[in-house]
């Protein structure tokens, strides 16, 4: 069984390089092919291609349409291996489609291909342990789960859990990172399976059958909360679980500036977090939208309390956009790209 490993990049060739090197050490019992998509435009795609060449990957002749990509290239390692991503494909998105849009480009192209029995969605700023994929596949098969997540640890504190998945908290209107700061060597708590609403979007596995059942990721979020919605859909339709032996080290926020500190976060991450919380609730729990709107607005003032007026403004703008029902790419941050 071969897995399609999908990585969405945005002008981060060095992150992708380190991720590929970690993947090169993967367990040979879980073969996979790597499918990259560059959301950052032609210059970023050229930098990605240059990085692949510098890593010793050899371009292979490719015949056929590039659609739905603007450009498409195929590479292979000098020595074909059953694991470590012997086949590497790199596609240029026609525009910046966001996280789900990038994932879905490859899912649409790969879904008809019977070679792939599952899909591993992985962030570029991650370093998976050698057995991370094997553990995901094993857990999916053991329990008949359609979607399985990894446990994440940070690069700075690998001995502590960053998250073992997400749980939506309707009263405070935000997701909880499950078992955050718990020692990584400790097993998950007995209640985690019931509390789990979604995996971390940085590393999770989806079976071919699950994709047929729940469909692709919802692209209207652009960034943030699309993984939470997909997880809830999987939980209801085909089963959701954590693979506790699948460990992935994660930088977090490398592309969007999603630092955990309110003052350090980028305006983009703050804006989308507040906009998309309302969008998520409108789609999944519409009856709770009035309460969510009040809570999210009230919490914007926390940015003023920590001396971050710029992020307070971004939060209020995001909240207002969410209240108006705005979705997709926020042109106030990306409008200059469309003009190129």
Each PLM stretch: what is its role?
Residues 12-25, 47:
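Short, well-formed alpha-helical segments that are part of the catalytic scaffolds
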Residues 21-31, 54-56:
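Short, acidic, metal-binding catalytic loop of nucleotide-sugar glycosyltransferases
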Residues 38-71:
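A conserved acidic beta->alpha catalytic loop
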Residues 52-57, 84, 92-95, 127, ...:
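Acidic/His-rich active-site region of diverse nucleotide-sugar glycosyltransferases
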Residues 70-76, 85, 92-111:
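Glycine-rich, basic loop-to-helix element that forms the pyrophosphate-binding segment
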Residues 115-127:
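Short beta-strand-to-loop acidic/aromatic patch adjacent to the donor-nucleotide binding site
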Residues 197-216, 220-247:
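A short, conserved alpha-helix in the catalytic core of glycosyltransferases
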Residues 268, 273, 285-340:
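Non-catalytic, C-terminal membrane-associated alpha-helical segments of glycosyltransferases
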